[in-house]
Amino acid sequence: MKSERSYPIYKVNKKAEASLVGGHPWVYENDILEFPETEPENGTLADVVSPKGAYLGTGFVSLKSKIRVRLISRNANDTFDASFWRRRVEYAWAYRKTVLEPADLSACRVIFGEADQFPGLPVDRFNNILVTQTLSVGMEKLKPVLFPLLAEVLRADGQTIDGIYERNDEALRAKEGLEQSKGWFELPGESHPASTQTEICENGVYYHVDFENGQKTGFFLDQKYNRRAVARLAAGHTVLDCFTHTGSFALNAASGGAARVTAADISADAIAMAQRNAERNGLTNMDFLCEDTFELLPRLEKEGHPYDFIILDPPAFTKARRTVENAMRGYKEINYRAMKLLPRGGYLATASCSHFATEELFIKMLRSAAKDAHRQLRQIEVRQQAPDHPILWGVPETNYLKFFLFQVI
């Protein structure tokens, strides 16, 4: 039974109704049959109803985006006060404590946007700092309430939180009519740390994290257990880690007992950080190359280098459907070259972090690359993102990371 509260109402078509009933939280402007008589203020709440007027959910309105409403609740009796949001944060943190190993809680994703019913809000923890990206206008308006609650809930569980840093230098904010910026969020009555750098430990490997200038929030936490899987297989092998970024896979391979590891990246800054991380971990079985992988792999094949384990973890080659075809050509090229470079019996770890490069497309690409390289793929493992980046069924956008381990024969 619906409560007495009153929000503006959007009536949607059958297509949107089916999507919402199936679990997706987004309402696109093109799927709205009837708009409120008076358009609500940007970032405020509205109800969504079916073509027959049945309540479907309540969400934040975005007047600048093609996604007009992002649901936060499907309970018509919810009251969206501070207590509601505190419960949401507590629920998200309790989930992380359940699915992650205790040692991993100091560097983890605390909130994963829609998968935790905080649309457009990723929050990462790096020791005593929370780093956020506010990618929807609803979450932007909620910050004065929500961000202090994030610190309060974790502190109440005995966690040390000294500050919240905002990485809102993200182009997606423009689609919500939001400006780009970065800096400390001012928690009421508190000062923030002077430094925007910290150190984390993951799988026993230490990393320097620059959460002011690093990519995204400063470090990619979603591959933590995939890196561990690579370390387990790397012992005794000669490893090439392409797109190494700050060296995470390479460092895990080296610490896992690889005979030699070469870490390659096109960015000189990334290579410098990877070298710094190697030194911090006392790893001497590593070399570093600042080179484009698309040029590196053909060169190494021509020169006959003896790598028997290759890791491909590129950045997203596509962030839109219209560029998927070109992206798949890029994925095929690097995988084909890696398969050609590897000796028979060598190992390949290959990944894609693009939601639009679906698992079906990725598998099709791998089969094609193997055929052209005259190789067969013996599957060892198929993996996804770590569970602190949960996949919410009904929301395919949360299922983005593909990770395969093969023996190439």
What kind of region is each of these model predictions?
Residues 1-127:
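Non-catalytic accessory regions of SAM-dependent methyltransferases
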Residues 111-124, 143-219:
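Non-catalytic substrate-recognition/targeting regions of SAM-dependent transferases
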Residues 236-245:
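Conserved class I S-adenosyl-L-methionine
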Residues 246-259:
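Conserved SAM-binding loop of SAM-dependent methyltransferases across substrates and taxa
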Residues 260-265:
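Conserved SAM-binding motif I beta-strand of class I
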Residues 269-311:
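S-adenosyl-L-methionine
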Residues 307-337:
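Mobile active-site "lid"/loop adjacent to the S-adenosyl-L-methionine
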Residues 333, 347-409:
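C-terminal catalytic and target-recognition region of SAM-dependent MTase-like enzymes
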